[in-house]
Amino acid sequence: MMTQSIRRSMLTVMATLPLLFSSATLHAQANSVQQQLEALEKSSGGRLGVALINTADNSQILYLADERFAMCSTSKVMAAAAVLKQSESDKHLLNQRVEIKASDLVNYNPIAEKHVNGTMTLAELGAGALQYSDNTAMNKLIAHLGGPDKVTAFARSLGDETFRLDRTEPTLNSAIPGDPRDTTTPLAMAQTLKNLTLGKALAETQRAQLVTWLKGNTTGSASIRAGLPKCWVVGDKTGSGDYGTTNDIAVIWPENHAPLVLVTYFTQPEQKAESRRDVLAAAAKIVTHGF
């Protein structure tokens, strides 16, 4: 009886002061999330950046979201999107074939190495770069666009003044602390990823192709996806580099909720540090709790 009375009293207070209660609750929840992310970062021994956008109301959860981090292979999303943008005015572009030579191969080429002395279409290169993180595929996309600066120019055309791509694979993964090359911020990347996959940055056909590629990613099972309910749909792009840099950027479709856009960037002090995908999974679990 006493429990029921307490519940009725709480409901009365909530009904009488909904705005005050809601504001206090949200503030407490936000503080809890920040504290959990801070504790995660401290225990990991590295630097963690997180940006989550809830597209239901455009609210955000941010942690070091305005600090620069090396993008590593998450930059492949921008290069692939730039080619998709070109295809809006050239319907045959994605079928254009690109020669693959043995001398093109770099340090990680799971798809391109199967096509040495042959060709791949730009569509195949886009899929290889995004779904298998093929570095030769990324370099071919960059070459087609005219160089890293053209990828940056595409970002600027979207209103992203933060993204910068300076090098090709694999040197763009050096992730030297304090080096601004090949970096962005979690918030800038989250906003751009939202525009590319859920907004109007690309025409519908091209937007759908980008989302399809991201949903088909094969490299993200231990990163953001590992921190989410199995029934949620995820499209993501991972990245890794020196200094134990471990990244993942994702569009997430929870059950019965508007999409979420989540960027998790993590780096460490030692150049030879191991990747920490578990940190990204833990961060994803923290910021998506309650959705």
UniProtKB/Swiss-Prot annotation:
Record bears the keyword Hydrolase: yes
InterPro entries to which the protein is assigned, alphabetical? Beta-lactam/transpept-like (IPR012338), Beta-lactam_cat (IPR045155), Beta-lactam_class-A (IPR000871), Beta-lactam_class-A_AS (IPR023650)
The cross-references to PROSITE patterns, in alphabetical order and at most eight, read: BETA_LACTAMASE_A
> Which Pfam families does this entry report, sorted A to Z?
Beta-lactamase2
**Where is coiled-coil annotated?**
none
| A GO molecular-function descriptor | beta-lactamase activity
Q: Which residues bind substrate?
A: 237-239
Family annotation (Gene3D superfamilies): DD-peptidase/beta-lactamase superfamily (3.40.710.10)
Please give the catalytic activity noted in the UniProt record.
a beta-lactam + H2O = a substituted beta-amino acid
Keyword Secreted attributed: no
UniProt record, GO biological process: beta-lactam antibiotic catabolic process; response to antibiotic
Q: Tell me which residues this entry annotates as catalytic.
A: 73 (acyl-ester intermediate)
Class in the EC hierarchy, top level? hydrolase
| Keywords tagged on the record | Antibiotic resistance, Hydrolase, Plasmid, Signal
- Task of the protein: Has cefotaxime-hydrolyzing activity.
Q: Which NCBIfam families match?
A: bla_class_A, blaCTX-M
List other remarks. Answer: The class A beta-lactamase family has a specific amino-acid numbering system, sometimes called Ambler or ABL numbering and often misspelt as Amber. A multiple sequence alignment was used to derive a consensus sequence and then the consensus was numbered taking into account insertions and deletions. This allows use of identical numbers, e.g. for active site residues, despite differences in protein length. UniProt always uses natural numbering of residues, hence there appear to be differences in numbering between this entry and some papers.
| Name recorded for this polypeptide | Beta-lactamase CTX-M-5
Q: Which species does this protein come from?
A: Salmonella typhimurium
Taxonomy, top ranks, is: Bacteria, Pseudomonadati, Pseudomonadota, Gammaproteobacteria, Enterobacterales
Q: Which gene encodes it?
A: bla
